[in-house]
Amino acid sequence: MEVEISGARTVGSGRLCSKNSAMPPVVKNLMESSPGETETFRPLLDLPGVRLEQIVSNGQASAEGFWYDQKNPEWVLLVRGEAVLRFDPGGDVTMKTGDFLLIPANTRHRVEFVSADAVWLALHFQP
């Protein structure tokens, strides 16, 4: 079985192998991001049942009246910045650099506030 992982692949044993053995794996930096006017999502890992992405918020909170309500749990880590997540029910959760939390499946939530420099890691998975 082969699975794509950001320019590499796993092979039966689960070992990571370069697609071209003459070339080393490509190293990328999580903190490299372009400032912009919109929130950007960069996939880092995409496996069956598991997706890891970088989110650069660029100060973009959820649109007025918009709520996330996802069928699978999501674990989020605020790598840099500050944010306020609003849960329905549950109220607000204030986050700062280094804070993480697990959002259970089917939990209505939104980003009420996020700083312009905010960078997240979001892990979506099937339980």
Residue ranges of predicted features:
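Short acidic-glycine-tyrosine-enriched beta hairpin
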Residues: 90-105
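General beta-strand recognition
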Residues: 51, 84-86, 110, 119
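Short histidine-centered beta-strand/loop micro-motifs
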Residues: 42-44, 63-70, 86-87, 93-94, ...
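Short, conserved beta-strand element in jelly-roll/cupin
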Residues: 69-84
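A short, N-terminal "cap"/entry segment at the start of jelly-roll beta-barrel domains
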Residues: 15-67
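Ligand-binding loop in jelly-roll beta-barrel domains
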Residues: 105-127
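A generic "binding-loop/recognition-motif" signal
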Residues: 48, 71, 91, 107, ...
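Acidic, Ala/Val/Gly-enriched low-complexity intrinsically disordered segments
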Residues: 2-4, 8-11, 22
